[in-house]
């Protein structure tokens, strides 16, 4: 049985999603969701049920199955013969997969137990997007090594800023609960706020470097990468706006010691601009305008 999705106006590319692929995507989603249920159950357990805050050694192990199957399905969705497809649904799914992968890797070195209650549920929902919003057009110039490098770097930058945004949300909740004197049990496994803040700026610095490389390669090699000179579209404007926001934030941290709520607001503003730059433009073109 086949569920077909096509570009009705242009009819450029016919993309079919098989029942097998749908079931496999559901399996990935249920894998993430099942893990999320257990994580939230442990997170909301009364303090008396946990004598001391402990790490959950089983969580990274349990994450291997959905993470690996998710990677396989993304590979099949993106690489179709000699063509390369990366629609808005697949792009978001790749970003959340990279986000989970980075979190999974870092969890062996940092205490990030509280962050997993946000990352894993998001993966459960967004891993289904390649089925709901499949690509309808192949990307151009995908044979160029420079294009592939540009694409990989940009997706890594998005993933790091996604982690930074989730990190900021967790810090905001933690700060509010500390002031109220009512810190949830799962947040007691997190490092102190100052340690989390230092980690946040490390993440943002790494993302800023990758974003700089993405924008720089787009400017210098625009004609080779995209077949036309760089144009100041809303995608370009929002991309540079996010670069300015994150750059100003890092400069403010270095020069004036910015921290706390100021850093949180700047992080979310930069991430929102980045979402509008890439995901927003792809959504409008592919879903609304069907181009």
Language model features by range: what are they?
Residues 251-273:
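Interfacial loop-to-transmembrane junctions
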Residues 217-222, 243-257:
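Transmembrane alpha-helical segments of integral membrane proteins
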């Amino acid at each position: 049985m086949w569920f077909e999705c096509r570009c009705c106006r242009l009819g450029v590319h016919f993309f079919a999603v098989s029942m097998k692929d749908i079931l496999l995507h559901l399996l990935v989603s249920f894998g993430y969701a099942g893990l999320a249920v257990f994580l939230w159950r442990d997170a909301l357990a009364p303090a008396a049920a946990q004598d001391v805050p402990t790490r959950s050694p089983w969580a990274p192990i349990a994450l291997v199955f959905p993470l690996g199957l998710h990677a396989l399905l993304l590979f099949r969705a993106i690489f179709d013969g000699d063509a390369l497809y990366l629609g808005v649904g697949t792009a978001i799914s790749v970003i959340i997969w990279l986000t989970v992968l980075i979190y999974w890797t870092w969890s062996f070195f940092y205490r990030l137990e509280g962050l997993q209650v946000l990352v894993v549920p998001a993966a459960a929902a967004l891993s289904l997007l390649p089925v709901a919003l499949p690509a309808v057009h192949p990307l151009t110039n995908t044979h160029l090594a420079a294009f592939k490098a540009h694409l990989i770097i940009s997706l890594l930058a998005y993933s790091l800023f996604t982690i930074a945004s989730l990190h900021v949300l967790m810090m905001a909740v933690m700060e509010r609960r500390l002031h109220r004197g009512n810190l949830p049990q799962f947040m007691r496994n997190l490092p102190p706020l100052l340690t989390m803040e230092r980690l946040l700026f490390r993440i943002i610095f790494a993302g800023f470097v990758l974003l700089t490389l993405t924008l720089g390669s787009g400017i210098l090699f625009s004609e080779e990468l995209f077949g036309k000179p760089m144009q100041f579209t809303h995608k370009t404007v929002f991309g540079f706006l996010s670069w300015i926001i994150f750059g100003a934030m890092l400069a403010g941290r270095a020069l004036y010691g910015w921290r706390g709520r100021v850093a949180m607001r700047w992080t979310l503003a930069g991430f929102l601009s980045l979402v509008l730059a890439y995901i927003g433009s792809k959504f409008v073109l592919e879903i609304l305008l069907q181009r």
